[in-house]
């Protein structure tokens, strides 16, 4: 809590010190990539508007997907199809983008700290292809099951370091989220068998992010 308060004080003090004479920093377009501990990659495009120099509000549009899965719902008669095993979703994420004034400044670059709390809204729907199989495990046909039960939203925060080479800014650091990548699947079932027990226990995820932004 003390760290958060110190960060906010630095943001407000920096905004007051700089003044509002230069509007070139008010609009920021960004492209962010992220890798997480839940074996997901994430890519998003963002726009933020800065009413004051070091605090902006905006929205991101993106997608996340698993590159490795942790559970396969299956019985002796069926199993989930290979193409349905990795979770994925498009999302919309409103967020705040906070930056400190430059802590290190040279002729070509300003370096400081940044934070971005956000609210991720995923597509509240999931669909799975079921592969039917015979007693030898060979496929005999396909079916489909879908559902919209599950926690479709998540809270997230990114904390890191930025380097501003006006008008381009690079940011990198740590990302945390309470996103459950299996949320929309846990409530699904096929022929009386629930998918939930096949998936790992719900846990928060952490990871690393890199952003390239351009100020207008």
Model-derived regions: residue spans:
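Residues that define the transmembrane beta-barrel architecture of outer-membrane proteins
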Residues: 25-27, 37-43, 65, 86-94, ...
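Extracellular loop and loop/strand-boundary signature of outer-membrane beta-barrel proteins
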Residues: 30-33, 75-86, 141-148, 194-200
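Cleavable N-terminal export/targeting peptides
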Residues: 1-24, 216
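Predominantly the C-terminal beta-signal and adjacent terminal strand-loop region
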Residues: 154-216
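Membrane-embedded beta-strand positions of outer-membrane beta-barrel proteins
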Residues: 27-33, 57-61, 94, 113-117, ...
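Flexible, solvent-exposed coil segments and beta strand-coil junctions
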Residues: 20-28, 68-79, 133-143, 189-193
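Gram-negative (and chloroplast) outer-membrane scaffold detector with strong preference
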Residues: 46-137, 213
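Outer-envelope beta-barrel architecture signal
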Residues: 16-29, 53-59, 107-113, 166-168, ...
């Amino acid at each position: 809590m003390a760290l958060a308060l110190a960060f906010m004080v630095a943001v407000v003090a920096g905004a007051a010190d700089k003044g509002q004479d230069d509007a070139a920093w008010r609009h920021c377009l960004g492209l962010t990539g992220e890798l997480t501990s839940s074996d997901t990659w994430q890519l998003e495009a963002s726009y933020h508007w800065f009413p004051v120099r070091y605090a902006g509000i905006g929205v991101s549009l993106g997608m996340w997907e698993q590159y490795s899965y942790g559970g396969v719902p299956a019985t002796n008669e069926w199993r989930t199809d290979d193409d349905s095993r990795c979770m994925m979703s498009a999302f919309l994420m409103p967020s705040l983008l906070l930056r400190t004034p430059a802590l290190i400044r040279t002729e070509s670059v300003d370096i400081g700290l940044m934070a971005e709390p956000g609210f991720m809204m995923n597509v509240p729907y999931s669909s799975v292809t079921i592969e039917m199989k015979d007693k030898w495990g060979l496929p005999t046909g396909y079916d489909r099951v879908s559902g919209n039960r599950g926690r479709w939203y998540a809270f997230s925060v990114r904390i890191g370091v930025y380097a501003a080479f006006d008008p381009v800014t690079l940011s990198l650091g740590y990302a945390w989220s309470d996103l459950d990548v299996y949320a929309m699947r846990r409530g699904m079932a096929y022929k009386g068998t629930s998918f939930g027990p096949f998936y790992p226990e719900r846990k928060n995820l952490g990871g690393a992010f890199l952003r390239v932004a351009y100020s207008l």
